[in-house]
Every structure is written in structure tokens, then in C-alpha cells.
């Protein structure tokens, strides 16, 4: 693993380590690249010559297949879709830049936004659903509060969806 900023890995020979322990052949690649290739070969992208896949989780990832070839770049990080700027004065990203899509469009960002909103809105249903512990806030809690019509959760989800739209529209236009 050359670099994984969300895992704090830097030049870790993960494939070799797993191979040595299991004796099995191991191929390590970017998770979003592998997911995109799988969708291209056997899923939603099957039959297309080109496609883009966006993954949302701890961060924002992506994989791009162009004319039947997975774009990997010189170090396997050709489609780091979470690291283009959508707010140049925005939050600092762990990559060192400010306002990256990942800081607004990841599930981690959604949870952080909900926790910040909870601090200002003690009446929010988010508190009860999270058993009065910010640490218990996750996507399910946020969406349950949203479905229940909680104003704080509705505002958080609407803001999150706005940033998703900005980010995905930018990806489409690239």
C-alpha cells in the first residue's frame, strides 16, 4: 500500500504480508478501482465502453474505466475523486488541501455535520436516537431522524445532498 490517508498507511507491503501468511496469490489495488472494474465487467457498467463509479464511505473514492481500460495513473491513484475542491475556503482535508469533496460528500462528513448540528440543537431527535451519545451517531441514526421529520436531521441531510450534487455534477462534467 503506497498511501492510504484514512488508514495512516504509507509504503506497507500488504500484499506480500498476506501472501506470506496465507501462501495464496494476492493482488492489492485501490478499493474503488477494484469496485469499478467489477461493475464494468459484471455489474452496472457491463456492456459500456466507459464508466465512472463513485464510492461513498469513510472518504469519497472513484474508479474510471475509459474505452475498456481502468485508469490507474502512475501510482494507482488516477481517480481520487474525493480530492477535488468544491469549496476553496472550506474545511481542511487530511490530504492537506481545503474544501475537498470528501470533506462534504463522504459518510464521515455526514456524521460530522450531524454531530455539529446536534451540539446546537439539543431538542433534535438525533439525541434520542443516538441514546444521548454523539459517538452513537451513524448514517442509520441520521436517516431515521430524517424520516421522522426532525428539522435538524432534515437540514443536515439536505446540505449533504447539496454537496453530493455539486461533487457528482463536477465529476460528470470532467
Enumerate the language-model features and the residues they cover.
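A cytosolic small-molecule/anion-sensing beta-strand core signal
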Residues: 66-67
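Short, active-site-adjacent cap segments at secondary-structure transitions
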Residues: 34-36, 61
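Hydrophobic "anchor" residues
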Residues: 1, 70-71
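ATP-binding/phosphotransfer module of carbohydrate and carboxylate kinases, centering on a glycine-rich
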Residues: 15-24, 38-49, 70, 85-174
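Structural signature of FAD isoalloxazine-binding scaffolds in flavoprotein oxidoreductases
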Residues: 77-80
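Short glycine-aspartate micro-motif
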Residues: 27, 50-55, 61-63, 94
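Short beta-strand-loop/turn "lid" adjacent to the catalytic site in phosphate-handling enzymes
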Residues: 1-11, 27
Amino acid at each position: 500500500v503506497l498511501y492510504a490517508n484514512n488508514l495512516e498507511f504509507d509504503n506497507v507491503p500488504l500484499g506480500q504480508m498476506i501472501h506470506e501468511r496465507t501462501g495464496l496469490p494476492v493482488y492489492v489495488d485501490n478499493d474503488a478501482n477494484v469496485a469499478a472494474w467489477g461493475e464494468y465487467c459484471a455489474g452496472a457498467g457491463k456492456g459500456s465502453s466507459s464508466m465512472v463509479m463513485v464510492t461513498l464511505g469513510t472518504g469519497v473514492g472513484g474508479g474510471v474505466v475509459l474505452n475498456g481500460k481502468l485508469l490507474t495513473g502512475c501510482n494507482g491513484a488516477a481517480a481520487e475523486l474525493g480530492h477535488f475542491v468544491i469549496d476553496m475556503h472550506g474545511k481542511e482535508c487530511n490530504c492537506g488541501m481545503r474544501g475537498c469533496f470528501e470533506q462534504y460528500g463522504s459518510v464521515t462528513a455526514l456524521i460530522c455535520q450531524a454531530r455539529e448540528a446536534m451540539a446546537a440543537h439539543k431538542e433534535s431527535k438525533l439525541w434520542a436516537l443516538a441514546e444521548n451519545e454523539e459517538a452513537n451517531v451513524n448514517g442509520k441514526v441520521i436517516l431515521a431522524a430524517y424520516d421522522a421529520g426532525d428539522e435538524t436531521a432534515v437540514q443536515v441531510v439536505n446540505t449533504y445532498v447539496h454537496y453530493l450534487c455539486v461533487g457528482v455534477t463536477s465529476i460528470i462534467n470532467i
